[in-house]
Structure formats: structure tokens, C-alpha cells
């Protein structure tokens, strides 16, 4: 069965900076997915990438997401890591608690 090793946690980042949202799964067999404020977010080179690309592709369980060039409009919000079930017979999909990512403004 898949289970959490590390769930996403609160992060702060300056505009234009990079930030890694952790998400590590034990016995990962399903696929990693990310959502921001309830909306799916895909992997996009130059913006959203796997923090450890070789790890995410393998079964190591590291689904951590790296946000590049953070900005308030696209990146500030509540992020969730999700993992699809190991197989259609198992109900071991995972949905993390929401973790806030705060893009600091110029106040």
C-alpha cells in the first residue's frame, strides 16, 4: 500500500524565486499529480518541474514539485499532492492536506 513519508508544507517565496513543495510517498506505484486551489497543475518546463526528475519517474516516491520564477497570480495558493491508486483493484490513492504557498508581495 502507498503511504505518506512527507506531505507538502507551508512555504514562502519571493517573487521571481524558486521553491520546492515536498511530497514523498512510500511504496509509490501510482502517478503523482498536483493541484493549486482545487485546479490541476501540469508539469511545464521552465515553470513547474519535478524537484528530482529521475526520482519522480521511478518508484522512489519523490513527487516533490519545484516552482520556478514564482509569481503571485499563478503560484500563491493552497497546493495538494495526489497519487493515483497502485492498480484499479486497490483503493490506495493519496491526497495530501493542503499546503499554502505564499508569494511575498512588495508591501
Task: Kindly give the residue locations of the regions a language model identified.
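Short beta-strand element of the conserved SAM-dependent methyltransferase core
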Residues: 64-65, 101
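Solvent-exposed loop/turn motifs of extracellular immunoglobulin-like beta-sandwich domains
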Residues: 13-22, 58-62, 69-82
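Eukaryotic intrinsically disordered and solvent-exposed regulatory patches
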Residues: 6-9, 17-21, 66-67, 87-88
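Immunoglobulin-superfamily Ig-like beta-sandwich domains in protein ectodomains
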Residues: 1-5, 9, 35-64
Amino acid at each position: 500500500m502507498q503511504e505518506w513519508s512527507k506531505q507538502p508544507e507551508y512555504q514562502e517565496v519571493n517573487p521571481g524565486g524558486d521553491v520546492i513543495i515536498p511530497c514523498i510517498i512510500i511504496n509509490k506505484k501510482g502517478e503523482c499529480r498536483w493541484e493549486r486551489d482545487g485546479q490541476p497543475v501540469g508539469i511545464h518546463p521552465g515553470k513547474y518541474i519535478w524537484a528530482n526528475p529521475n526520482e519522480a519517474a521511478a518508484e522512489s516516491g519523490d513527487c516533490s514539485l519545484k516552482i520556478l520564477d514564482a509569481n503571485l497570480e499563478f503560484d500563491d495558493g493552497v497546493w495538494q499532492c495526489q497519487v493515483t491508486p497502485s492498480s484499479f483493484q486497490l483503493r490506495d490513492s493519496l491526497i495530501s492536506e493542503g499546503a499554502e504557498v505564499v508569494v511575498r508581495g512588495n508591501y
